[in-house]
């Protein structure tokens, strides 16, 4: 058993390896291998922020491109463990990123997942008029509402529905809209379908631009709030703006209060002016939902389908960006040192402190919930570590068993001879 443990420890040390090479511009490139299954180059950085870094990697066996997220354990509000748990529950559904591997390493946690395309905010900004056509908006509405329905059916609410949190897929999934970023996602009921209790006095959680009126009022979020946020997002897609987009305030609290007042002032028929009446009907319905009430998703999907039919629109997946040849999914390789990447990973020295400069899209989270997330993530991280240890010991035992069987067969062959 001691030899098994030693070999298991040896395998752990080889879970991640690296080598350095120079590219044509003489820039140092770190190549990091993960469990001999995946690898990524330090130059293939897709993005990053306060949560960590994301790289484009590759599956060494299938040569399939993947996304590799790296998160420091020292960040204030960790996300990867929480996100991986939710995505694993949704792994069999369309429009949710597939998770291939979650593994801890010293001061970082690594998650390997499906590589996706641009988010809807970037696609909107790349469009000629900084807005989408009615056709694209309605096709998006149907897919996004379907994602929200699936999420809710799995007892979760997203709590941060906005354009940046939906992306297009790649290759054969290019017509699929994916829901991403589950940092604020929470369960609204348990396995016995007991709904979370109604509460007041909550701080705004999510992004103020798309937050529901109930969220602004400090009421605990439920399914209805995700749906109201979707409505604001659809208005934004069609018009390229929201009436409260340029609201300013001396403090966050003053600004958010002004945004709430603007939302209360804008009745659905005024907010949806110039759009099909189905948008107006959508808002009237979702704003009247009760805290624990289950939304009629098929009714809402029917509204969007009805709007398409009345406007002679076919759901043929010919989105606006398909016509724009300038849109691509190039990597973003900015502001990140490639020097000794592997040693920095081991030591947890990567700078995870980049801030989002778009203040109007600032994400908020209740302080009490930060502590809840941290405690929950500690438990889940220990589960992942223990699971990895058990898997390694199990693999080693299988190897030893196979080796014993081979030796037995060999000895029998010798005896027969």
Regions picked out by a protein language model, each given a short descriptive name:
Residues 169-205:
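Activation segment/activation loop of eukaryotic-type protein kinase catalytic domains
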Residues 152-170:
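Catalytic-loop of the protein kinase fold
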Residues 53:
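Conserved N-lobe ATP-binding subsite of Hanks-type protein kinase domains
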Residues 140-141:
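Activation segment signature within eukaryotic-like protein kinase domains
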Residues 34-45:
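Conserved N-terminal boundary motif of the eukaryotic protein kinase catalytic domain
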Residues 98-109:
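Short beta-strand micro-motifs within the conserved protein kinase catalytic domain, predominantly
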Residues 59-81:
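ATP-binding glycine-rich loop module of kinase domains
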Residues 116-126:
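Structural motif in protein kinase domains
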């Amino acid at each position: 058993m001691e030899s098994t443990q030693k070999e298991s420890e040896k395998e752990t040390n080889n879970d991640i390896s690296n080598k350095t090479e120079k590219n044509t511009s003489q820039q140092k490139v770190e190549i990091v291998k993960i469990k001999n299954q995946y690898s990524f180059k330090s130059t293939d950085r897709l993005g990053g922020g306060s949560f960590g870094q994301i790289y484009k990697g590759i599956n060494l066996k299938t040569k399939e491109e993947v996304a590799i997220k790296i998160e420091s354990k020292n960040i204030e509000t960790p996300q990867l463990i929480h996100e991986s748990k939710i995505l694993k529950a949704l792994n069999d559904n369309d429009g949710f990123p597939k998770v291939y591997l979650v593994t801890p390493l010293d001061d970082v946690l690594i998650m390997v997942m499906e590589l996706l395309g641009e988010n809807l905010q970037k696609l909107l900004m790349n469009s000629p008029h900084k807005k989408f056509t009615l056709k694209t908006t309605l096709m998006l509405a149907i897919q996004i509402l379907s994602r929200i329905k699936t999420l809710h059916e799995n007892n979760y609410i997203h709590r941060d529905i906005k354009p940046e949190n939906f992306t297009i897929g790649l290759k054969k999934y290019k017509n699929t809209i994916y829901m991403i970023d589950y940092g604020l996602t929470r369960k609204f009921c348990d396995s016995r379908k007991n709904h979370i209790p109604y509460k007041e006095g909550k701080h705004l959680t999510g992004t103020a631009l798309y937050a529901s009126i109930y969220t602004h009022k400090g009421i605990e979020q439920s399914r209805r709030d995700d749906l109201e946020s979707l409505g604001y997002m659809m208005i934004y897609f069609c018009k390229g703006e929201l009436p409260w987009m340029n609201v300013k305030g001396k403090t966050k609290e003053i600004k958010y209060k002004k945004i709430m007042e603007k939302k209360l002032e804008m009745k659905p028929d005024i907010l949806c002016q110039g759009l099909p009446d189905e948008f107006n009907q959508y808002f009237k319905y979702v704003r009247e939902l009760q805290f624990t009430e289950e939304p009629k998703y098929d009714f809402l999907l029917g509204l969007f389908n009805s709007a398409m039919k009345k406007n002679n629109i076919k759901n043929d997946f010919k989105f606006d960006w398909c016509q724009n040849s300038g849109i691509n999914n190039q990597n973003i390789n900015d502001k990140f040192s490639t020097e000794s990447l592997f040693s920095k990973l081991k030591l947890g020295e990567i700078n995870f402190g980049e801030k989002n400069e778009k203040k109007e899209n600032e994400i908020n989270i209740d302080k009490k919930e930060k502590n809840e997330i941290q405690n929950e993530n500690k438990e889940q991280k220990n589960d992942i570590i223990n699971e990895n240890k058990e898997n390694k010991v199990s693999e080693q035992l299988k190897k030893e068993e196979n080796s014993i069987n081979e030796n037995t067969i060999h000895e029998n062959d010798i005896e027969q001879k």
